[in-house]
Amino acid sequence: MQLNGSQIFVEVLCEQGVDTLFGYPGGAVLNLYDELYKNANRITHVLTAHEQGAAHAADGYARATGRTGVVLATSGPGATNLVTGIATAYMDSVPMVAFTGNVPTSSIGKDGFQEAYIEGITVPITKHNFTVRRVEDLADTMRAAFRIAQSGRKGPVLVDIPKDVTAAVCEFTPKQPEPIRTVTTYNEEQVRWAADLINAAQRPLVYFGGGVRSAASCQPLRDLLHKAEIPATYTLMAAGVVPYGDPMNLGMLGMHGCYTSNRAVAECDVLIAVGTRFSDRVALNPKTFAKNATIIQIDIDASELGKNVDVDLSIVGDAAYVLNAMLPQIKPAKHPDWMTMIQSWQAQDYHPVSDPTRLMPHQVIGEVCNQCGPDAVYVTDVGQHQMWAAQYLRHTKSRGFITSGGLGTMGFGYGAAIGAQMALGRQQRVVMFTGDGSFHMNLNEACTAVSYELPIITVIFNNSVLGMVRQWQTSFYGKRYSQTDPHRKTDFVKLADGFGLKGYRCTNLPEFQEAFADALQQKGPTWIECIIDKDEKVLPMIPGGGDINDIIME
């Protein structure tokens, strides 16, 4: 059948199972938006306040579901406004397809109105990108973009579509989506060697990351831990893969991880790293990281093997396939001496002391867990509040904690929460944690949450400073607080009212308990401002370049 480019665009989106699209219209994408208008019953378009918010929403949608997030923006500034969101997804291996409009093909390279070379700009932050110069290539290019985003190590793909391509006509043939390509092969001898090392270990430890968030990987990982009594620690991106309360779960590792996890890495004799890249927030000193251990690394991306830390055995493959192949070769085991050592370290873990005269982050987060139960999805911005959420939430679901890890994007949270809420439905509870610094970055997305009546509860930790940077200035820069006290006078309760949502302000725990309970009853979005002390710290902390011997506990 004969279709124009805009019709092909919609048909392929539907063919690929896209039900929700985040974006912002503009001149170069008017033809696409006209077709989306005609097909509003097939694809829900979510209009955000800013293209960056749309990109983060597509990201949040993908993280909450595992499906590909889709974002659409016009040419020039519309496209460049996506860059931070695309880079955020790239660093955390999130499947996303970003569509951008462009000037007509005859005008490319002539510095026309709202022209930007977005293909070149995004080369370092995408798995692949395309510029479609012929309408005949549009359908298969879009299909390739979705396939690439989900295949192997997941990530964002950009498709740039000049305006004339959206109007041109060609023959279109519908196709079934191709199966997702994953790495099903692995070196069987390496897997046997890994199993032998694990079976011989006296102090084994599993260290896992975001590469095991899929349901297919979670269960074999848990089976490995319990079959051979192997304790485990995880990165920020993997919270919830092994549930809170599991006796094998030692807690988060790294700069703001717990004492036990960091000590266990230093003392283990075999470290099994699964779906993780030894980032500099975990392996703060690559030369001393797990220095007593034989290190096994399993990763779907061969380029990550041994990149940041020298490893003794590397296995290329999908974690689910490798772990399932390894499990029958693992002998049931107990490690009583090792577990006794770990229990002694757990007695030394940092536990904040509550102060009844003020509101403290661990109290707030604990109360959120009490009132929400195990099924809520939590989203964060970036800063101290992000680490407090990672430390104190009772993570139980592999996709229940959504945060920007690799890029550390302030302003990520509200857009991502909108995407997660749209993906999961209004009956699913989504709570977003932010700080007054991060929230100022993209709080304009409140109008999006209001427009779509999304019942997102936003908890704002307000210490009136840029807390994480200020903490570093306190510890390492002689308390010289350069530009971390912005002296802002924002009244978040009044601002909430201006956006058309309900706002609360709390200075103690009973006030927060009452406010959160009321927020749970609201049909639309709410903000709860929590006034906390500006000297509140994220502890423990290991300085950059340090190790367990440098940990700060007070």
PLM regions with names:
Residues Y24-G26, H45-H56, V71-G78, R133-R134, ...:
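Active-site nucleophile and cofactor-binding loops and adjacent substrate-binding regions
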Residues G69-V71, V159, Y378, F401, ...:
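Well-ordered beta-strand positions enriched in small/hydrophobic/aromatic, beta-favoring residues
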